[in-house]
């Protein structure tokens, strides 16, 4: 009798131990920069495959207001973790010295900031924008880099008419010829134009990173108070997200299914192509292939800060890479390799 009871107790204890992550789930709100589209697949893959759950996390993923505006939500603690533009974080930190928000994981090693136009506008080089009308949403992450892009390419911006447009009408205005070009994320504007009936060979995408910008793109950033109180939660979220990115890279066709479950009105063919473009151009660069997912090159980050300083007047001392990005929550490099 004693043996049976002991065995039963032992089995129960082992079962409890094996279920402990699931039974102590921490509710965590995570804000994307934008809609549930192809490039958001890694987070939903991590959710569907139980990677977050294995870290003891019950993650809720919400859409966001753009890659710039959401930073304030993380700073305020509305969302403890978010996915936003690291260059805008540099400026935000300078303007809000009491908000020690830091990036903890780089996602877009090469930013998707782009100038998108139609072939008929004959915008083949940056200076071709002179004399044109550029449609730009004020909260757009790409437009946030406009001044640096102008400086690097010696554009006379007095000859470029900037027209403030909303995100919903940005691509329609370009398609209708109401503006000559727009700022946007490459994989967003390109495929949005395809859905408007514009042919592939009529769409011109000019990546700012191919024209002088050394900037990074969107990163995972964390509220400082939350990170201080919950370092294991942050590390677990980062670890699970990296697994989601690696799985998405290995099998984008399977990964896109996780997006479609949350956005049934989307066109799966378009979203898969959007995902593949972002993986090729933004997520998985030669540097990431060599060094793994999630980290940064401090020298490049310092160059990016210097580039921001060309067109942005810092109120305080220019930050160092360590002021903006911390690798302390990243898993070992071996776990981040593709």
What are these regions (language model features)?
Residues 26-176, 180-187, 206-208, 213-214:
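Short, glycine-/small- and polar/acidic-enriched structural segments
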Residues 19-24:
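Sec/Tat signal peptide C-region and signal peptidase I cleavage site
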Residues 301-338:
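Conserved C-terminal helix/tail region of periplasmic/extracytoplasmic solute-binding proteins
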Residues 8-18:
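Bacterial N-terminal signal peptides
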Residues 1-9:
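Bacterial N-terminal signal peptides that target proteins for export
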Residues 157-161, 200-204, 265-277, 314-323:
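Short, surface-exposed acidic
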Residues 107-117, 200-226, 238, 277-283, ...:
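Periplasmic-binding protein-like
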Residues 228-313:
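Secondary-structure end/capping motifs
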């Amino acid at each position: 009798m004693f043996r049976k009871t002991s065995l039963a107790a032992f089995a129960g204890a082992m079962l409890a131990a094996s279920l402990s992550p699931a039974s102590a789930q921490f509710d965590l709100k995570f804000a994307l920069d934008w809609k549930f589209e192809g490039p958001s697949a890694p987070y939903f893959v991590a959710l569907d495959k139980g990677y977050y759950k294995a870290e003891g996390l019950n993650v809720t993923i919400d859409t966001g207001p753009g890659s710039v505006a959401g930073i304030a939500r993380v700073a305020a603690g509305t969302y403890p973790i978010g996915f936003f533009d690291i260059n805008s974080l540099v400026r935000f930190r300078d303007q809000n010295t009491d908000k020690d928000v830091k990036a903890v994981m780089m996602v877009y090693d090469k930013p998707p900031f782009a100038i998108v136009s139609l072939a008929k506008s004959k915008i083949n080089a940056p200076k071709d924008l002179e004399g044109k009308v550029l449609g730009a949403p004020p909260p757009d992450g790409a437009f946030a880099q406009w001044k640096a892009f102008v400086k690097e390419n010696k554009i006379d911006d007095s000859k470029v008419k900037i027209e403030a447009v909303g995100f919903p009408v940005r691509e329609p205005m370009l398609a209708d010829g109401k503006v000559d070009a727009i700022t946007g994320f490459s994989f967003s504007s390109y495929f949005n134009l395809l859905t408007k009936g514009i042919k592939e060979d009529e769409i011109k995408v000019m990546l700012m990173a191919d024209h002088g910008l050394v900037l990074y793109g969107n990163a995972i950033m964390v509220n400082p108070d939350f990170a201080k109180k919950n370092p294991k939660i942050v590390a677990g979220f980062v670890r699970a997200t990296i697994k989601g990115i690696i799985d998405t890279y290995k099998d984008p066709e399977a990964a896109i299914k996780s997006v479609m479950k949350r956005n049934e009105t989307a066109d799966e063919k378009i979203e898969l192509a959007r995902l593949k473009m972002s993986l090729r151009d933004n997520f998985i660069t030669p540097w990431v292939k060599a060094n793994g997912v999630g980290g940064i090159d401090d020298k490049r980050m310092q160059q990016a800060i210097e580039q921001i300083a060309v067109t942005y007047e810092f109120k305080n001392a220019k930050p160092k890479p360590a002021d903006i990005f911390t690798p302390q929550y990243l898993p070992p490099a071996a776990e981040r390799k593709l």
